[in-house]
Structure formats: structure tokens, C-alpha cells
Amino acid sequence: MNINYPAEYEIGDIVFTCIGAALFGQISAASNCWSNHVGIIIGHNGEDFLVAESRVPLSTITTLSRFIKRSSNQRYAIKRLDAGLTERQKQRIVEQVPSRLRKLYHTGFKYESSRQFCSKFVFDIYKEALCIPVGEIETFGELLNSNPNAKLTFWKFWFLGSIPWERKTVTPASLWHHPGLVLIHAEGVETPQPELTEAV
């Protein structure tokens, strides 16, 4: 049975959710954003959309409904490049996925690593497929010093006593706030951007 959604989703759409685990809660606090997990739609299996994601322990493909169910209170939002994607661009995005699957999750969120984490996974797919940065690479110093809500004691504990201030990373928040993305639909998100009134 085909699952119906409130909007028409497409390959390349970025799915934002909120994982309730403690680590991901600290990611939200550090980046001052409701979302702490992202994936990317890469197709449809005849019943549901398929989402590629980097998660613990390995990057994989799941269905959109399962992806949403893992979110706290099933909150989610979907964004798309404001200009939309051509069929060739969608194909290029899909072509980037296989080589990135079954990669270990990097719990230290180091961008310059062979391991994956969710925002790096989506950021790199767009960068390699379309030469479009849909987020921002920043250091932990820039991230944590820019937000008074960040709990440094947690991150010192997480990094075994010493925060790697110069380590580069990319956060779900930087994707969420990227000006080139427009909101297609949101469920349970308190302050979403205005939804599109016209087709992209």
C-alpha cells in the first residue's frame, strides 16, 4: 500500500528530525536548533520514499516512515533547494549514495574523516554531486563559542577531557538554516519557516 504524505516529496529533498538520545540533545543545544539528525530522499520503492542516512553504527537506507518514527514525537521537516533539481541532478545525487553506505558513524563529528555522520553525509552528497554547499563547515570553537546554551562540561566529558576546538565539523543546524533551502512541509516543528505557496 502506497503511503500518502501531506506534500509531494522528491529525490534530493533533505529530511530533518530530532533524535531524543542524550548525545543528540546536546547537539541541538550546542547548535541552537530543534533538529539534530538529517537524511536525504533518494527514491521510492512503490510504497514509501527511501531515505539515505548516516546513523549509528553504519550508514544505510531506510523508509521515510521509519525515519520519521525515530524522531522525538515524530517531528520532522523537509526542505528542498529553492530552484529545485533537474532529473540529471537527481541522478547525480543518487549516484553518490552507494559508495557512502555501510560506513562507520563518527561519534567525534570530525568532518575530515573517512567515517560518516548525518550532516556530513548529506553535505558531501550535495557538494560532490552538484558542487552546492547546503550547510557550513565550522570548527568546534566557532560552534560552541557562538552559543551560550552549549554545555561545555558535557563536551569535555564526551571528548575525554579536552574539546578539539580546531576540529572542523558540519551540523544539522547549518543545513537547516541554509538560505538556499525552502521548506516543503513540517510536522510538530514550533517555528518553521513559511511553507511554499507555489510549486518549486
UniProtKB/Swiss-Prot annotation:
Gene3D superfamilies: endopeptidase domain like (from Nostoc punctiforme) (3.90.1720.10). It comes from the Bacteria. Signal peptide: none annotated. It holds the Pfam family Peptidase_C92. To E.coli YiiX. This is Uncharacterized protein YebB. The lineage of its organism: Bacteria, Pseudomonadati, Pseudomonadota, Gammaproteobacteria, Enterobacterales.
